[in-house]
Structure formats: C-alpha cells, structure tokens
Swiss-Prot record:
Phylogenetic classification of the source organism: Eukaryota, Viridiplantae, Streptophyta, Embryophyta, Tracheophyta
Entry EC no(s): 2.4.2.60
Catalyzed reactions per annotation: [ADP-thiazole synthase]-L-cysteine + glycine + NAD(+) = [ADP-thiazole synthase]-dehydroalanine + ADP-5-ethyl-4-methylthiazole-2-carboxylate + nicotinamide + 3 H2O + 2 H(+)
Name of the protein in question: Thiamine thiazole synthase 2, chloroplastic
GO cellular component: chloroplast stroma; cytosol
Role of this protein: Involved in biosynthesis of the thiamine precursor thiazole. Catalyzes the conversion of NAD and glycine to adenosine diphosphate 5-(2-hydroxyethyl)-4-methylthiazole-2-carboxylic acid (ADT), an adenylated thiazole intermediate. The reaction includes an iron-dependent sulfide transfer from a conserved cysteine residue of the protein to a thiazole intermediate. The enzyme can only undergo a single turnover, which suggests it is a suicide enzyme. May have additional roles in adaptation to various stress conditions and in DNA damage tolerance.
Length: 352
C-alpha cells in the first residue's frame, strides 16, 4: 500500500507552536508548571493493586535451553535480516536516535542502529557536567511534544527535569517499531566502499574490537546498506570515527576538528551542515562540527535532535522517498523549514 506524504511525516515539523509562558520580572526563569504532551497529572497515576498475588507469586516453568534458543534464534534472524538493509545508523546518541525515530515512521524503510556501548544514548543520559537537567532551545521543543516528553518552559527554551526522560522515551518509542533493530555492544571497524560510494559498514563485537591488540586476529562481519548515517559524536577515543576514516582512505581531505564553544552559532551550524558528505554517507550531530570546524555546542541538545531528523530526511531523499528536504513532504512551520537547507558539499571547512 502506498504511503501518502501527509501520513508519512506526522512530526514536529508539521506541529503547531506552543505559546510561551507569561513571565513577570519577579517570575523564575523557568516556569514551574510542566508543559508538553508528556506532562503527568497526579490524578492519572493508578493506585490499584498489581493483577497478581504478591504473597504467593510463582513464575511459569521454563527450560533453560528454551531461553538460550529464543535469544539465539531471534538475534541470528536479525543478523540475517539486516545484513543488507536500507539504512545503517552508526552511533545511538541523541542525534542517531532522533534520526532513527524519524526514519522509522516509514514502515517500508529497514533501519539498523549499530552502537558500540552496551547502553545506547551516548551523552544524552545527563545534561552538562553530570547534571540531570536537559536544556533544549526552541523551536526544537516541538519534537519533545511529539514524543510526549514533559518539560518546564521559558520564553526561548525548555528544560527537561532529567535528560534520561528524553533518551528513554525516544528509545522506547523507536524500538517498538518493527522496521528497526538496535545492535548494541557492536562496533563499526571500517566502511564498505565501492566505486567511490559508501555501501555499508564492517562490524565486530565491541569486546573483540577493543582487544585486537591482546588477542589473535579476529576477523569482522559486514552489513551492506543503501545509506550510512554516521552519528559518532565529537572527537575522542571512540568519537568522530566515521569522518576520520573517510580522511584515512582519501575520500575527504581534512577533519579540522571543532572550534571553541559558541552555543548560538554551533547549534544553527550543526543543523545547517548536516548533509551527505560523500556519496552514500550522511553525517549528523557533533560529528558535523568535527568535519566542518564549527564551534562546539556545549550542554544544549536541540541541535542533536533536529540534526538527526534532518539526516533522516536526507536519507529518505537518497532512497527516493518523500522527504522534507526537497519539499515532497510539506513543512508547515517557516522557521523550521529554514533549518532544512542542504549545505554545499564543496564547503568542507566553515568559518564560524
């Protein structure tokens, strides 16, 4: 059955803005009343007893071999299914998860997420300096409304009381969809490149990848993909690996690294410069700052969400599907439509 453009993208880009909370000079910077579709009312919390007797609870019997077979059969089936897929997303931080969420709205697109850590989410489990709150500048709060994440609202930004509320919500919504598989504890060791185009990734168990120097040779596996989205984060021992590998193999000339912190410039630049940097590979999130020399962003997260969504629509465009980049899906909000500008691939380094 054909999917219409209107039904394909029921996202924050077609949503209505929430009015800013009215503040007086004596008001706190952040309004205390939670806003957003996920705001919880005390009356909605059920106080009923569990549907079983806790004093004499017993589980149904099971053979240990059944548990082993269920895990093994399902995982191996997923490996076979996603050995050749539409999109592979490398890195399950806030940008990668936002990209996967947006992409998976089209049920005909198969998506594999590869995350080296056992626990996906990247740096989005906390705000800055290990603090709990997550700050999101408007109008990216519309994405939170879509997800149903509650927040406190100020005039130009919103605050989620704990960053884990965003990460756990987008992850649970995403992984419930049948066209997505998260392969966590799996590392991407290299790219598949054929005829100047990225055509997939080379994978290995993360623990194996971390111990190549101490063990004998352990060859990897592969996943072919029509599009690879690299969301590996900023530079570090495990960061920006996608663009650094492109430089190693001569597909790009330079990875200048991100500049000093400038929140206002950085978030706009990261969204604007999210793009297909070489045929078959889209870069999103903080990895964009590494390849373009944009400023570092600091502890605000709106650009990660919107960059991920933009990467999803660039992937849809590459797949020949309706998308919000070339206008085959209409974006209602003019402010958000301006974010969807494809940066020139010729401009490799950006002066910020």
């Amino acid at each position: 059955m054909a999917t219409t453009a209107s039904s394909l993208l029921k996202s924050s880009f077609a949503g209505a803005r929430l009015p800013a909370s009215t503040r007086t000079p004596s008001s706190p910077a952040v309004v205390a009343t939670p806003r957003g579709a996920g705001a919880i009312r005390a009356s909605s919390i059920s106080s009923s007893n569990p549907p079983y007797d806790l004093t004499s609870f017993r589980f149904s019997p099971i053979k240990e071999s059944v548990v082993s077979r269920e895990m093994t059969r399902r995982y191996m089936t997923d490996m076979i299914t996603y050995a050749d897929t539409d999109v592979v997303i490398v890195g399950a931080g806030s940008a990668g998860l936002s990209c996967a969420y947006e992409l998976s709205k089209d049920p005909s697109v198969s998506i594999a997420i590869v995350e080296q850590s056992v626990s996906p989410g990247g740096g989005a489990w906390l705000g800055g300096q290990l603090f709990s709150a997550m700050v999101v500048r408007k109008p990216a709060h519309l994405f939170l409304d879509e997800l149903g994440v509650a927040y406190d609202e100020a005039e130009d930004y919103v605050v989620i009381k704990h960053a884990a509320l965003f990460t756990s919500t987008v992850m649970s919504r995403l992984l419930a969809r049948p066209n997505v598989k998260l392969f966590n504890a799996v590392a991407v060791e290299d790219l598949i490149v054929k005829g100047g185009r990225v055509g997939g990734v080379v994978t290995n168990w993360a623990l194996v990848s971390m111990n190549h120097d101490t063990q004998s040779c352990m060859d990897p596996n592969v996943m072919e993909a029509k599009v690879v989205v690299s969301s590996c984060g900023h530079d570090g021992p495990f960061g920006a690996t996608g663009v650094k590998r492109l430089q190693d193999i001569g597909m790009i000339s330079d990875v200048p690294g991100m500049k000093a912190l400038d929140m206002n410039t950085a978030e706009d630049e990261i969204v604007r410069l999210t793009r297909e940097v070489v045929p078959g590979m889209i870069v999103t999130g903080m990895e964009v700052a590494e390849i373009d020399g944009a400023p570092r962003m600091g502890p605000t997260f709106g650009a990660m969400m919107i960059s991920g969504q933009k990467a999803a629509h660039l992937a849809l465009k590459a797949l020949g599907r309706p998308n919000a980049v070339d206008g085959t899906i209409k974006v209602v909000s003019p402010a958000l439509r301006q974010e969807f500008v494809i940066a020139s691939k010729d401009d490799e380094v950006v002066d910020a």
